[in-house]
């Protein structure tokens, strides 16, 4: 047989045959399952009482027990446990079965020292490694650490290159004549407007997220993730614009707020130059990723957030990017013009950035605190949508700070 050993990473095995009977479809191959204890997508079943059980109960279920008993009906058999290798002779060959059950979530299995150790242990045992190395002897974390350094360096380059371009003759008209000082909020009403607008924006983003993601991902498009997140981004951008308009006419204008002085109101020429500068910064900055990929076969990433080189066919998906314009432009205006004030002192930017990222923090907190404490997800039907927020936390926070 071509395949000697199989380790299913956060995926279910085949437990029954075509007729629905318990079966050992793997024969005398060595087979294991990496079953994250809090997996959001696999290892679920309905128990004898008709109760739907999620991944934390996997080891107590009939599927796992049949698997560990080499495909027989587990009824009446002694319960088998995780992280223990079981052997049985099949067709003259000793085969093994094992389930690893680390206390992690699905995406963490691809970024976990425990999961990596289990993979090494499995194949060391299954393939009878002649000179085994301890499974704890892992160095991939260093690679990830330096990938993250590259990610930080990319962000620094974007800011530095964009700033440098403002000192060129073509774009110097976009640069402020002097260092812009934060606006002084002189009364309690102004402070209330500041905090309430930030809170309202965060609440709006949280409340519509699951609904708009379900709507967007149900559309018949090639990129459902981009569509769902893009629609969410657009609606949040529109809400931010409306918030700024309401603030301006209800408070700002009455208290001497000058849109031209703040840079909100600009000429068409400056608007065109701003768009051109943005395009140049994007092309040059992302060009660095292609250079790193070509010469060093490296990219910049940390866990679920990555900047990668891509091939030409991917360019057809570029129009999805326009769905994100409303949010990031309005966020830039809000951060630099409407919320840049003396509230919070030197931490003003951090406050605004935290509030921008708050929806992407709170929703996963609710999901996983519920999951870990009850054994059932808060929003099982939105499990993937909640996971998509993991990189967005860093994106929203960093983009606001970079603004």
Feature-to-residue mapping (PLM):
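Soluble extramembrane regions of membrane proteins in the secretory/endomembrane system
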Residues: 1-139
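Juxtamembrane/start-of-transmembrane alpha-helix segments at the extracytoplasmic/lumenal side
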Residues: 137-151
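Alpha-helical transmembrane segments of integral membrane proteins
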Residues: 192-403
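Short secondary-structure junctions and interdomain/linker hinges
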Residues: 126-133, 152-155, 159, 168, ...
């Amino acid at each position: 047989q071509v395949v000697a050993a199989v380790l299913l990473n956060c995926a279910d095995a085949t437990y029954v045959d075509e007729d629905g009977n318990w079966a050992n479809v793997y024969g005398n191959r060595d087979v294991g399952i990496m079953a994250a204890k809090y997996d959001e997508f696999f290892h679920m079943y309905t128990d004898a009482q008709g109760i739907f059980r999620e991944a934390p109960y996997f080891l107590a279920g009939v599927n796992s027990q049949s698997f560990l008993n080499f495909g027989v009906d587990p009824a009446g058999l002694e319960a088998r446990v995780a992280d223990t290798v079981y052997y049985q002779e099949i067709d003259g060959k000793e085969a093994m079965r094992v389930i690893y059950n680390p206390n992690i979530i699905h995406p963490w299995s691809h970024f976990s020292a425990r999961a990596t150790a289990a993979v090494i242990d499995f194949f060391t045992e299954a393939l009878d490694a002649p000179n085994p190395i301890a499974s704890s002897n892992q160095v991939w974390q260093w690679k990830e650490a330096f990938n993250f350094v590259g990610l930080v360096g990319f962000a620094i380059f974007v800011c530095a290159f964009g700033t440098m371009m403002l000192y060129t003759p073509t774009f110097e008209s976009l640069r402020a004549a002097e260092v812009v000082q934060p606006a002084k909020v002189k009364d309690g009403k102004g402070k209330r407007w500041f905090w309430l607008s930030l809170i309202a924006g965060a609440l709006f983003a949280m409340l519509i997220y699951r609904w708009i993601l379900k709507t967007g991902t149900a559309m018949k498009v090639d990129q459902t993730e981009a569509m769902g997140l893009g629609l969410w981004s657009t609606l949040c951008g529109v809400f931010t614009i409306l918030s700024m308009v309401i603030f301006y006419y209800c408070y700002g204008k009455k208290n001497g707020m000058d849109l031209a002085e703040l840079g909100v109101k600009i000429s068409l020429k400056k608007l065109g130059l701003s768009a051109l500068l943005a395009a140049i910064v994007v092309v040059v900055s992302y060009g660095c990723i292609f250079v790193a990929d070509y010469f060093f076969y490296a990219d910049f990433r940390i866990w679920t957030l990555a900047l990668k080189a891509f091939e030409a066919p991917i360019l057809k998906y570029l129009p999805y990017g326009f769905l994100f314009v409303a949010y990031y432009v309005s966020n830039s205006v809000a951060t630099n013009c409407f919320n840049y004030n003396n509230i919070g002192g030197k931490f003003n930017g951090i406050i605004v950035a935290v509030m921008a990222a708050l929806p992407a923090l709170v929703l996963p907190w609710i999901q996983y605190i519920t999951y870990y404490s009850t054994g059932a997800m808060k929003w099982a039907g939105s499990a993937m949508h909640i996971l998509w927020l993991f990189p967005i936390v860093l994106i929203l926070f960093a983009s606001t700070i970079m603004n």
